[in-house]
Amino acid sequence: MAVGKNKGLSKGGKKGGKKKVVDPFSRKDWYDVKAPNMFQTRQIGKTLVNRTQGQRIASDYLKGRVFEVSLADLQKDIDPERSFRKFRLIAEDVQDRNVLCNFHGMDLTTDKYRSMVKKWQTLIEAIVEAKTVDGYLLRVFCIGFTSKDQQSQRKTCYAQQSQVRKIRARMTDIITNEVSGADLKQLVNKLALDSIAKDIEKSCQRIYPLHDVYIRKVKVLKKPRFDVSKLLELHGDGGGKTTEAVVSAEGAVIDRPEGYEPPVQEAV
């Protein structure tokens, strides 16, 4: 065994030296996530992405991101009937530091969905595929439960199979007519107000009384070819550049874009 000093470690070689700590957030940028103008809340949050370097474009990594937001947050409403609905928005384009999103689906929260399933009643579900006027192919899931008659002394409220088939056919007809007769913006407004489920519940009362009728889930199966102008129409003024009024030293009002930073002066 050789006795002596290890020159590599004493001089601070490759193995013994300290690694330079680099903050990973120093090469990332924050982008504002914008919802379409069919919702009251336009800015739903911020997202983080690596800064553009060479052929790695930041906007390419932002497109396709899906954001899940509660309807109560989108509509600035504390109504409990809105809090259990979740809307999915997908990033389709990037304008400056704004990520423009479009509708990508809807779902109910797990706790709400499981709380509706109970004993002594019949669960009726319908799955419908329909296309909107502007070319979006959607798969809509509807759910409903039979309701007990107040005058009845029976513990259960089971429906016959013939009644279940009639109710499911009525659900399919109403959903197909509502989806095929509206564009995506009108359909999202109907989903937010839950008007389709209310029409189904009212229409099926003659067959068998129902309660807890909801559009449980909406999936976007196919979209039309991407058009920037249509996306900008959905966002209106909120998707583009936002300006703020600034009063100069002379008293004139100057409109500056959001996030404006004055240039660095070389000499004072």
Swiss-Prot record:
Subcellular location: Cytoplasm
InterPro entries: Ribosomal_eS1, Ribosomal_eS1_CS, Ribosomal_eS1_euk
Keyword Cytoplasm in record: yes
SMART domains hit by this protein: Ribosomal_S3Ae
Intrachain disulfide bonds: none
Region (Disordered) residue spans: 1-21
Superkingdom assignment: Eukaryota
Keywords linked to the UniProt accession: Cytoplasm, Developmental protein, Differentiation, Oogenesis, Ribonucleoprotein, Ribosomal protein
Example GO BP: translation
GO molecular function: structural constituent of ribosome
Family under the similarity heading: Belongs to the eukaryotic ribosomal protein eS1 family.
UniProt function note: Essential for oogenesis; required for late follicle cell development.
Assembly information from the UniProt record: Component of the small ribosomal subunit. Mature ribosomes consist of a small (40S) and a large (60S) subunit. The 40S subunit contains about 33 different proteins and 1 molecule of RNA (18S). The 60S subunit contains about 49 different proteins and 3 molecules of RNA (28S, 5.8S and 5S).
Matching PANTHER family: 40S RIBOSOMAL PROTEIN S3A (PTHR11830)
Protein name: Small ribosomal subunit protein eS1
Protein source organism: Drosophila virilis (Fruit fly)
Protein's gene: RpS3A
